[in-house]
Amino acid sequence: MLHYSVVFLVIALIAAIFGFGGIAAGAVEIAKILFFIFAIMAVVSFVMGLIKKN
């Protein structure tokens, strides 16, 4: 689960780079939303991984 969260976070970051760079001006809001969603998912997955190890 952590793997998928990190993959989607990277995809959101790439979309943000394109959006903030002016390449896809319409994708800026989507990239912002995806970034925060997947950043939260990555943190939750990391914490869940730590809990399951113990």
Swiss-Prot record:
Main location class: membrane
Spans traversing the lipid bilayer: 6-26, 30-50
Keyword match Repeat: no
InterPro entries, per database record: DUF1328
Localization annotation: Cell membrane
Keyword Coiled coil applies: no
Keywords for this protein: Cell membrane, Membrane, Transmembrane, Transmembrane helix
GO CC annotation, single: plasma membrane
Protein topology in the membrane: Multi-pass membrane protein
Family, per entry: Belongs to the UPF0391 family.
Protein name listed in UniProt: UPF0391 membrane protein Bpro_0879
Species per Swiss-Prot/TrEMBL record: Polaromonas sp. (strain JS666 / ATCC BAA-500)
